[in-house]
């Protein structure tokens, strides 16, 4: 099942969506990187804008559903987690017993995360790795859990990233993904569209001097597969007991799968 609408471009390469714009697959990753280099210092503010502050509640729900144990040998891989926001929450929930590896393709995001880890005294419990979610630099069966929050929609080949998640998880390991989703309440959908397409780019220009980056982030949400379609993709990658929970009228959704 395709991760997004793809077609062959004029030069023979596969075309992908960069928001609502068609681009060659060789261009998409560099364009996404440019967006996140631009917003790295204001990433939490960006999520506050995109979610009206609700991302903090959703992330707490994600960690609560994961329920990390207070065990020193328990290891979690947080992908596209450069600023450390999810990893810090997981470590707190494990009473600082677990070990987290934060992976991101964007060095600017990782720099923010490293600074925050040092500031919060968590650096000994976290490894920061700059790498691609489609080609994880880890051996098979290395982690007890794989988390990704608001990142998988920016991966050019989502199906490949899901296969890599399955590969690096231990048997019995857990996959959890938090992502903006398909709003299912008609009245809420209209309100959120008005906020997203009209207010957010203007606020992005005001806060980060980059309205185009925020416009891409809004458009990328609309291009992401609907909940049932994404759940099917997770199953296709090999996961069992796949389920999802809608959050706040399905503005976001939590997807779960197990490696059995």
Swiss-Prot record:
The organism's place on the tree of life at top rank: Bacteria
One Pfam short name: Ubie_methyltran
CDD domains: AdoMet_MTases
Keyword Transmembrane helix annotated: no
GO biological process: aerobic respiration; menaquinone biosynthetic process; methylation
Top enzyme category: transferase
Gene3D superfamilies: Vaccinia Virus protein VP39
InterPro entries tied to this protein: SAM-dependent_MTases_sf, UbiE/COQ5_MeTrFase, UbiE/COQ5_MeTrFase_CS
EC number(s) per entry: 2.1.1.163, 2.1.1.201
Function: Methyltransferase required for the conversion of demethylmenaquinol (DMKH2) to menaquinol (MKH2) and the conversion of 2-polyprenyl-6-methoxy-1,4-benzoquinol (DDMQH2) to 2-polyprenyl-3-methyl-6-methoxy-1,4-benzoquinol (DMQH2).
Membership in a protein family: Belongs to the class I-like SAM-binding methyltransferase superfamily. MenG/UbiE family.
Protein name: Ubiquinone/menaquinone biosynthesis C-methyltransferase UbiE
Gene expressing this chain: ubiE
């Amino acid at each position: 099942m395709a991760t997004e609408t793809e077609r062959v471009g004029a030069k023979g390469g596969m075309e992908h969506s960069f928001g609502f714009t068609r681009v060659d697959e060789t261009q998409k990753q560099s364009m996404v990187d440019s967006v996140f280099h631009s917003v790295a210092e204001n990433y939490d503010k960006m999520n506050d804008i995109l979610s009206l502050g609700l991302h903090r509640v959703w992330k707490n729900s994600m960690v609560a559903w994961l329920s990390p144990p207070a065990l020193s040998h328990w290891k979690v891989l947080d992908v596209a987690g450069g600023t450390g926001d999810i990893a810090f929450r997981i470590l707190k929930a494990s009473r600082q017993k677990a070990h987290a590896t934060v992976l991101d393709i964007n060095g600017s995001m990782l720099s923010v995360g490293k600074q925050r880890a040092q500031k919060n005294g968590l650096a000994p419990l976290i490894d920061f790795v700059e790498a691609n979610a489609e080609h994880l630099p880890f051996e098979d069966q290395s982690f007890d859990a794989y988390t990704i929050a608001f990142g998988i929609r920016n991966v050019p080949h989502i199906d490949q990233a899901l296969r890599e998640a399955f590969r690096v998880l231990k048997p019995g390991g857990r996959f959890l993904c938090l992502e903006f989703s398909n709003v299912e309440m008609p009245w809420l959908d209209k309100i959120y569209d008005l906020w997203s397409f009209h207010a957010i780019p203007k606020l992005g220009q005001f806060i980060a001097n980059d309205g185009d980056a925020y416009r891409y982030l809004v458009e990328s949400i609309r291009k992401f597969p609907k909940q049932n379609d994404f759940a099917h993709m997770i199953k296709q990658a090999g996961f069992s007991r796949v389920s999802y929970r809608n959050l706040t009228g399905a503005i976001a959704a939590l997807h779960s799968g197990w490696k059995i």
